[in-house]
A protein has these predicted regions:
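Amphipathic alpha-helical segments used for helix-helix packing
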Residues: 100-122, 171-175
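Helix-turn-helix
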Residues: 20, 28-62, 66
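Hydrophobic alpha-helical connector segments
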Residues: 66, 77-105, 159-162, 183
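Short amphipathic alpha-helical elements of helix-turn-helix/winged-helix folds
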Residues: 24-28, 98, 102, 165
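N-terminal intrinsically disordered/low-complexity leader segments
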Residues: 1-16
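Amphipathic alpha-helical packing segments from all-alpha helical-bundle domains
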Residues: 73-76, 80, 120-146, 153-164, ...
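Hydrophobic/aromatic-rich alpha-helical bundle segments in the mid-to-C-terminal region
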Residues: 114-115, 145-190
Length: 198
């Protein structure tokens, strides 16, 4: 019988390479700023050809969008491990505190460019927005188990409000050059506000 424990599919290899390119771009972004990096610089540092870059990303801006894909792979694990057994308000606060910590690790320059009104992935009305989808799921599950939202509130409205608040936290953190602990700030603000949102 063959041992498949070290077997890598083409998709797995492509994902690894895409993450490598993203991480190289992120390092360069932290060193010299997003506006100062070029695709050629990324390729040189990553040890790949420009053709290989374009096989994985359509543009420099597309690298920013990969943040979302990268984060999504961690979301379900966070839900399963960190939120299990918590009350709904605690789940929502813990999830967004995690998002803020994950985002802060990417650096100020990344945040300024990704969390921009020009970035269509940040449109809170997009149906596929994973953060809203996750918080909706948490709220709907809690409601099925007897949690009652305030009159006139829906899971989507709560999720959208939370998402907008967190984007505001990220914007403020970026405007202040990352001078404070974003996750800690989010913990305090969301803990104070969560009751009014539900």
């Amino acid at each position: 019988m063959m041992d498949y424990t070290n077997f890598e599919t083409k998709d797995m290899k492509n994902r690894k390479l895409k993450e490598h390119i993203f991480n190289v771009a992120l390092t360069l972004m932290k060193q010299i700023g997003y506006d100062n990096i070029t695709i050629r610089m990324i390729c040189t540092e990553a040890g790949i050809s420009t053709g290989m870059f374009y096989k994985h990303f359509s543009s420099k801006e597309d690298i920013l969008a990969f943040y979302y894909d990268k984060a999504q792979s961690d979301f379900d694990e966070v839900i399963d491990k960190q939120l299990a057994g918590l009350s709904l308000p605690q789940q929502l606060v813990a999830f967004y505190v995690w998002v803020c910590g994950f985002t802060a690790d990417l650096g100020v320059d990344f945040c300024r460019n990704f969390f921009s009104s020009k970035n269509q992935r940040m449109n809170t009305n997009l149906f596929h927005n994973k953060m809203i989808e996750i918080t909706n799921r948490c709220i709907e599950t809690a409601c099925e188990k007897g949690f009652q939202l305030s009159s006139g509130r829906t899971p989507y409205a709560v999720s959208k409000d939370l998402c907008v608040m967190v984007k505001g936290i990220i914007f403020d953190w970026s405007a202040h050059e990352g001078s404070y602990d974003m996750a800690e700030f989010a913990q305090g603000l969301l803990s104070r506000c969560i009751g009014g949102l539900l």
